[in-house]
């Protein structure tokens, strides 16, 4: 098994902290306060230049500090961006721009444009992560202020109401992620824990606290298996490990979770990002610049099936995500301190 670099895209002159991709539209978040939208849909067929097809560069005056996180709303071209200036901006593509057939893709890149819909305020400090629920009805944000906020959105993505402020973490909250099929939220923190949140009696409550990491938990991702009711989560930490967690009881608001596995310890430095593919593969990346793929065998044992050292030269990798492109195939996208987004094929 191997990882092959398909394309290296130099998109920023400063660090790229986060990326998200929807129908070939890649959004980036950077220290330079810019958000770039790049069409990489045909990259798997070798049709994209070294710089990608830049569709839009969102106004760097919209945020006063680093843009830390970006997330496309499911099944739409509405984008949320969280910043160190403590705000979240909401952007949308003009549905008539560059999309003649209305499928959310890009038919005419020359007429593509994004507009600012809203700016959400509430956090007292840096916003570290933003994430949409499965249907785009809820937006979760987290911050250095130790809180997780859940916002209710209207259909157009223009109005946002805070419906819950979750303040059970004791330190900086680094990351939030929703379950792909259920209204379950996971938050990862500098307090070394992951917290699971569920809606109960029109309010959001802590369902579980996952303890086991011996350092900051930088991020997590849910399993995306539609053929099971089992809920599992992978996480990456400052302690250099990747762990698998499983819910073993959810008969009430309080759930019982166990640490099901600690994956083979390949990383020598903090793991900043993990991503669980629809095919069941887990990818991890972090401070050591190594990209690793794990697979669960028939005996339910996790094995390393591919790894690539120095994936961004000497630089740290801040994010890894599985993405699907126009040819229907899955690829890995990584972004790092070098300002590059690298697209990888797993063979």
Swiss-Prot record:
It holds the Pfam family WD40. One of its GO terms (cellular component) is nucleus. WD repeats lie at residues 11-48, 62-101, 122-161, 168-207, 212-255, 266-304, 311-347. InterPro entries: CIAO1/Cia1 (IPR028608), G-protein_beta_WD-40_rep (IPR020472), WD40/YVTN_repeat-like_dom_sf (IPR015943), WD40_repeat_dom_sf (IPR036322), WD40_rpt (IPR001680). The keyword Transmembrane does not apply. One of its GO terms (biological process) is iron-sulfur cluster assembly. Keywords: Cytoplasm, Nucleus, Repeat, WD repeat. It is found in: Cytoplasm; Nucleus. Belongs to the WD repeat CIA1 family. Interacts with NAR1. Essential component of the cytosolic iron-sulfur (Fe/S) protein assembly machinery. Required for the maturation of extramitochondrial Fe/S proteins. This is Probable cytosolic iron-sulfur protein assembly protein 1. It comes from Vanderwaltozyma polyspora (strain ATCC 22028 / DSM 70294 / BCRC 21397 / CBS 2163 / NBRC 10782 / NRRL Y-8283 / UCD 57-17).
